[in-house]
């Protein structure tokens, strides 16, 4: 990839990182190259922050089943990824301490609303995520488009749909590139809405905050340059601007410079 920082939405749940076992298969049909891969991975991140924000908190992905297919035909590349995570454990209160009053008040609520609170604070959820991509590269000019969809069980996480399109031009050892993308998040549970409608004064602030945190309708631009001064080392510089229609406080401009090593 040309970027220093990957597009946030499409890569907020990794497809290929973690500890585990895997199997790969490669075959050819004329000019078509087909690569298939299956991984059984587990992963723990101590300071995970969702794309919608929050404090760093521990997240653990247990026994993730990941299947990938990648195909190359002359100058074209296309494929897809499927991931099923039977159990994702997340420290919801660690990431959102403002929700602690919800837990304290739960015992005094009617059973239905109490279940809604526990649904929001559920820290063990099932996840299904997939993406598809297609690219073209003639060695000088390249383009790539990718779409991803992440679906969480009933929890405080947001279901997310993301896409981006990128293009670039290589000149000598330099690569110039630009990317445009959009991320759209919707609450995976409507429990927060039910609690808000119940007009529970003691919980209103926390619930309303969670509702807003789960929503995202953002778009971003990335412009960057890469300089390959060695076959295994590249200097990268990216400028990213993010605009959010639902929450202007998440809007940002980021300039990043770094070295990319390939071992």
Predicted regions and their residues:
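Surface-exposed coil loops of outer-membrane beta-barrel proteins
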Residues: 1-68, 199
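Membrane-embedded beta-strand positions in outer-membrane beta-barrel channels/transporters
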Residues: 20-24, 64-68, 129-133, 164-166, ...
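Residue-level signature of outer-membrane beta-barrel architecture
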Residues: 25-27, 70-73, 135-138, 169-171, ...
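Repeated loop/turn-to-beta-strand initiation elements of outer-membrane beta-barrel proteins
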Residues: 30-36, 75-79, 140-145, 173-178, ...
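Transmembrane beta-barrel strands of outer-membrane/channel proteins
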Residues: 36-42, 80-84, 145-149, 169, ...
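Surface-exposed beta-loop-beta
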Residues: 38-159
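Outer membrane beta-barrel transmembrane domains
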Residues: 175-232, 236-242
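Outer-membrane beta-barrel "beta-signal"
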Residues: 251-263
């Amino acid at each position: 990839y040309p970027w220093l920082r990957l597009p946030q939405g499409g890569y907020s749940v990794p497809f290929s990182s973690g500890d585990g076992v895997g199997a790969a298969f490669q075959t050819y049909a004329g000019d078509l190259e087909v690569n298939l891969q299956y991984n059984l991975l587990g992963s723990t991140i101590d300071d995970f922050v969702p794309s919608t924000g929050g404090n760093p908190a521990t997240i653990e992905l247990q026994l993730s089943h990941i299947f990938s297919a990648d195909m190359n035909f002359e100058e074209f590349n296309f494929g897809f990824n499927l991931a099923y995570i039977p159990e994702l454990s997340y420290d919801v209160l660690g990431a959102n301490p403002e929700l602690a009053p919800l837990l304290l008040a739960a015992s005094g609520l009617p059973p239905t609303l109490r279940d809604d609170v526990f649904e929001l604070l559920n820290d063990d959820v099932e996840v299904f995520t997939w993406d598809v991509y297609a690219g073209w590269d003639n060695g000088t000019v390249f383009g790539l488009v990718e779409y991803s969809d992440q679906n969480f069980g009933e929890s405080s996480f947001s279901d997310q749909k993301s896409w981006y399109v990128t293009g670039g031009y290589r000149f000598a050892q330099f690569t110039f590139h630009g990317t445009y993308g959009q991320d759209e998040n919707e609450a995976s549970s409507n429990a927060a809405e039910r609690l808000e409608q119940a007009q529970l004064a003691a919980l209103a602030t926390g619930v309303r905050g969670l509702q807003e945190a789960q929503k995202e309708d953002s778009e971003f631009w990335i412009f960057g340059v890469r300089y390959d001064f060695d076959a295994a080392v590249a200097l990268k510089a990216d400028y990213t601007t993010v605009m959010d229609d639902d929450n202007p406080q998440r809007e940002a401009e980021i300039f990043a410079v770094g070295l990319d090593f390939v071992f």
